[in-house]
Amino acid sequence: MKRIALLATALAFSACSPAAEPPVPAPETPAAEATPPAPSVTLDVLTADGIGPLTLGMTKDEVIAAVGPTRTPDAVGGPEPESCEEFRPERAPEGVLVMIEQGKLSRISLVDMSTVKTDKGLGLGDTADTVKTGYGDQAKASPHKYQDKPAEYITWWKGGPRTEPYVQDEAARGIVYEIDGTGKVGAIHAGGPSIQYVEGCA
């Protein structure tokens, strides 16, 4: 009889005890948001000294910090990339090509119908006559290496026309307008003596 009384007491106590609360779930950690791509850098006016944040003489690391690495990492930028290479920075506008020689920025080119203009307001697609009018007697025309007229090179150097057949002064700065077989600007190169190259790094 005593056992029955004890069992009844235990059951009554259990019924009066509050039910155990369910464990509180840990707050969910929000998924990390994908890092948005860096915006393109404003590069809208090309001069003989550079464009936007790019200045002739910058190191390759400085160029990459300013406008990003190459858009095409698997492409070879030149036959000897250790001494000279060209690449299209991923945050630069389409058609902007930079040349790195001996680890430093030596030339900036506009190709592939880039919409960037020079400080004279000239760009790809302009006629040779428009370029010559813009510079007057400060620019010099020379035959194109691979194409017949009207293809030619129109070269302008800061400080006036140069008399030497090939400018080697590392401090020289200029712009070359490469005129194609239709008589229009097909490419523009700005920078130091390397603006005279006709085949990439050569």
Regions found by a protein language model. Give the residues of each.
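Acidic/histidine-rich, surface-exposed loop or edge segments in extracytoplasmic proteins
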Residues: 40-49, 106-116
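N-terminal low-complexity, Pro/Thr/Ser-rich intrinsically disordered segments
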Residues: 26-61, 65, 202
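Sec-dependent bacterial lipoprotein signal peptides
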Residues: 1-14
